[in-house]
Amino acid sequence: MIRLAGNSQDGIQTAGAFLARLAGRSEHDVMTYMTIPATISGGPSIFQVRIGSGEVLSAGDEADFLVAFYQHSYQDHIGFLREGGVLLYDSDNVEPNLDDKRFFYVGVPITGLTVEALGGTAKDKGKNIFVLGLIAKIFNLDAEKLKRVITEKFSGKDQSVVNTALMAFQAGYAYPVGNVLTKHYRFEHIPRASGRAQITMDGNQALAYGLIAGGVRYGAGYPITPWSSVMEVLRRELPKYGGIFVQAEDELASVSIALGCSYSGYLAVTGSAGPGISLKAEAIGWASMAEIPIIICNIQRGGPSTGLPTNVEQSDLHQAIFGSHGDSPRVVLAPASVEDCFYIAIEAARIARKYSTPVFILSDTSLATRIEAFDEPDLSKLMVDPKPDLTPRQTHKPYPIDQITHHVPPGTRILDGKYPLLAGLEHDEMGHPTGSPKLHMAMTAKRRNKLRKLAEEIPVSEIYGNQEGDTLLVGWGSTYGPIHDAVKMARDNGEKVGALHLRHLHPLPNGLEKIFDKFKRIVTVEMNDQGVYGFGQLATILRARYCEPKITSFTKTDGLTFRVKEILDGVFKGKSFLARHIPREGAEVIHQAGAENVKTLKEVVPQGVG
């Protein structure tokens, strides 16, 4: 695992993304993690890349290779470098404690050499690419392929920008780092089992393309971090499929536009982060009452209020399920990985159409911004081409008591001349407003029962690890990878533990109680607060649903993703585990005191670094 630590204006996210995309194109598995400040003025920032030829599920607990651009970068992140790791630092700005013999130190005057290489034309603005050249040399990366990635990134800019970036890269690549680092490393290429081409993208991109594959052609939104990049992809791509995405004047307008598109016969999407979802709440409640299909993406961030706009949290689960006045049924899904962002969008579109209901997709900042490589989807089997059914009907009831609502697009001929209405007021089967107590009870049950029917068709996720035993870890969203790595490590140390990951959060799949019966305790792992009653948001739902006192939770609210060590320490309090690194079959890193022991790192690391 490589961690770049500097300031947000240094372009370390760009450099890290280049590494990730190179890894994906080289058929390696990859996962990234980044933090950026919420202020316009910028501040400390990191970008880390974990690369391997095996399955990479989490971003990693400790770095094998740390790049420090500033003194604060060194001081804040040296604790994340594992013993025997390499510290590459800008000797123009950093003075490390060389008496600390746990690490190997490589000091390079990065700032000065960058300015010198670029002739002062861009000052030190190319030092991120200079460092990329250094890393490429140290890790024996494909320099020509990396240059192509750089060129593609800046292809829309003036040619001088491309040339400057390539000059900075070449200067870093040519630096005689071998004079101070005697061992170079390379990633062994292991063909992927699927044999299919890989694509590399972040979670928001995967979500946007999944929506398109699922047949979404229209949508509207309002910019907010971290949802905005979904909008950017949809605004660029939807016109290629005959659709359009509108940037509305506010959140209420955006959800209203999307609802109009859906009623016209084309399933539409809107989205935001927590604050924007609060503003959309009334219209989403209207969609529940009118039974209009719509997809609502909530890219969760730290809250409440403006909160932590660039940090991760899973604190909007209750908002998604209960965030409306009255009994307002809706479906809530959560992707587990970047790849799953693509497939969960297709699932959301299917459910919205079949059950004429609002469907929430709860992603989060970690999934939105991290880059992963995965097998290219077979669009020939997945792509949905939406075509509204304008076939004339003899008659049409939009709200039959004993059936699921399916609206006909406006303009469809109704031969008996009885055209239905669309109302947010309680209504009868034709949509006419009514205050009948009997009808309100019947319609409330109708809207509720379609979610019960959905629960019957949701498959229960498979348990990873022990199928029965002492502890079952239950997660949702981006906690998938760290939980699975924690379970593997715990089982390697003799614990009888399994993991269950939920993609369908509301309604829950039927049959979970049979799984819970097989374990002595159930612990949800969540990035939200334990609340007044001492349980995370998912744990609260599960305890209410199953009345099971053995359900507890391990939660945190620091705005950072879970580390494997955190989960192990939080769930198995008082127990120590022999391995503090994440087990990786075929990867052997020997750690001993003294910087000279970096020489014990294997030249060929079959499963990657970290």
Where are these regions (language model features)?
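Thiamine diphosphate
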Residues: 1-10, 15-17, 148, 152-322, ...
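Active-site cofactor/cluster-binding pocket
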Residues: 1-214, 218
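Gly/Ser/Thr-rich loops at beta-strand to alpha-helix junctions
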Residues: 9-12, 128, 137-139, 223-228, ...
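Phosphate/diphosphate-binding loops
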Residues: 61-63, 69-73, 77, 81, ...
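Short, conserved loop/helix-junction motifs that constitute active-site signature segments
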Residues: 78-84, 98-100, 287-288, 376, ...
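A short helix->loop->beta-strand "cap" motif at the edges of active sites that frequently abuts
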Residues: 81-87, 101-103, 243, 266, ...
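Flexible, low-complexity linker and terminal segments
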Residues: 200-204, 208-212, 344, 349-610
